[in-house]
Amino acid sequence: MKIPTETFKSKGIEYIQRFEYNELSRASRNGKRHYETPDGRQVPSVTTVLSATKDMTHLHAWRKRIGVEKAQQITTESANIGTVMHRSLEKHVKGEDRTPGSNLIQQKAHAMANVIIDNGLNDVSEVWGSEVSLYYPELYAGTTDLVGVFKGAPAIMDFKQSRRLKKKEWVEDYFLQLVAYAEAHNKTYDTDIKTGRIFICTQNNEYQTFEIDDYAKWTGKWYAKLEQYYKKIL
């Protein structure tokens, strides 16, 4: 639903409310994240679909190589850093005050957020929404970090933390997330978003970014994953 445009600027960020984004309720089914859409249906999250259809060979090999306890420690620490970094970036986008925090994880996440702000968000000319709940009726839902305009084009944008720099072949799920959110936005709000951008900062403060290079290809792969998921659970 499009609404009358409201614009405000804070700390250099132009926040333009072009659409009425409603937060979706989250639910857990068999331990997997789902969302409740406005029609009352519960649909799987994008990450639930991707997790259920992912080849886990490399992950299992990594856990076996370093040990389950060490792997869990790394996973938990990375998740905590990612959560704090996302919160810091959300505050920046909304023009709220940000502080480095008092513990090492907070300080590291704050520094990583600064890297993304300085290297990636400078090319964002409009922000339409932050932490936006999106859904494709009857199929899936999810939350994207940012919807707005990147280098002149409407875009879905996500923030990621990493322990090291990524190769393109390692981030296929990121592309699938982006097109899933874009397809949901286009369906629900009658838009034509074809641009998606991932902003990454490593825990050593190295910046990296990836953009959807072939929207049709990645959209096809996403719908194939979705079909695989529903065949698996039905």
PLM region spans:
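Short, surface-exposed secondary-structure junctions/capping segments
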Residues: H58-R65, L226-L234
